[in-house]
Amino acid sequence: MNKIDSTLAERSSTHGSFAENAFDSQRLKRVVKRSNSYESMTHVQREALDMIMHKISRITCGNPHEPDHWLDIAGYATLVYKDLSNEAI
């Protein structure tokens, strides 16, 4: 097994199937993009929500007990908070 195959196998145990993940992630992102407030969001808010939706799909498709998924979500939310509070990000 080469390095790429090894990494993909390792990730599938925590992230689940890439195809399922892509489907769920895109579906979640469509919900956000259709929201009433999407157009008024900053690029920081939009990107953070995209990443949070991506992480949520990893939780629902993969291992929901993987601490890094939850830490990543908290990190993206914190970046938005800091941006809105005019703290350096």
What is each of the regions a protein language model found here?
Residues 1-89:
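Intrinsically disordered, low-complexity regulatory regions
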